């Protein structure tokens, strides 16, 4: 999976969205000799937006930050204490709109060979955890329902349960997009 992403991401034409605001997230892939895992966070319950949601570390692009990689690495260091030098950037995934369509989010796939001790920023991050990629590849682990929100256009919302956490929404769409770029493809169509 890692080699296929390393080769494919820099060469492929990715979808770029123009929106009034931009954000970036780091999609950390842990490859430390054990099973491949994706690193995620659960946001604290008292945040003004996306409280309690499972998410990748990330945030808004700051003025003067013209590179989504810089934003994703900065946010990962701020939110979970992941030093940028521990991340090998594999490439950029397609941009995704937020539900309100006002923000374009650029996911940055990054490889972590040796996971350091992580320290969550407790004001934003309630928990840091990892999901084995092999589990994410199993179609029977995913559920979905029709998105009935405004502007959904028949889109489905996908859900993945893991150790009491629910991966869904934008984060689930990013995971499924990442998996679609691997030789095995996405477990959900």
Feature locations, PLM:
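N-terminal leader/linker segments that precede catalytic domains of diphosphate-processing enzymes
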Residues: 1-56, 60-116, 125, 134, ...
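A short secondary-structure junction signal
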Residues: 101, 118-122, 140-142
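A short, charged helix-loop
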Residues: 137-158
């Amino acid at each position: 999976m890692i080699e296929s992403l390393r080769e494919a991401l820099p060469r492929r034409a990715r979808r770029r969205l123009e929106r009034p605001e931009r954000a970036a997230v780091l999609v950390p892939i842990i490859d430390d000799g054990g099973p491949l895992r994706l690193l995620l966070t659960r946001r604290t319950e008292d945040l003004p937006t996306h409280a309690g949601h499972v998410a990748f570390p990330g945030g808004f692009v700051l003025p003067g930050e013209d590179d989504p990689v810089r934003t994703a690495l900065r946010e990962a260091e701020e939110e979970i204490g992941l030093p940028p030098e521990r991340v090998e950037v594999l490439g950029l995934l397609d941009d995704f709109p937020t539900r309100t369509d006002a923000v374009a989010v650029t996911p940055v796939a990054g490889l972590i060979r040796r996971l350091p001790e992580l320290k969550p920023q407790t004001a934003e991050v309630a928990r840091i955890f990892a999901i084995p990629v092999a589990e994410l590849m199993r179609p029977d682990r995913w559920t979905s329902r029709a998105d009935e929100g405004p502007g959904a256009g028949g889109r489905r919302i996908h859900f993945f349960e893991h150790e009491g956490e629910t991966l869904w929404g934008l984060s689930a769409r990013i995971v499924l997009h990442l998996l679609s770029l691997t030789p095995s493809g996405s477990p959900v169509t």
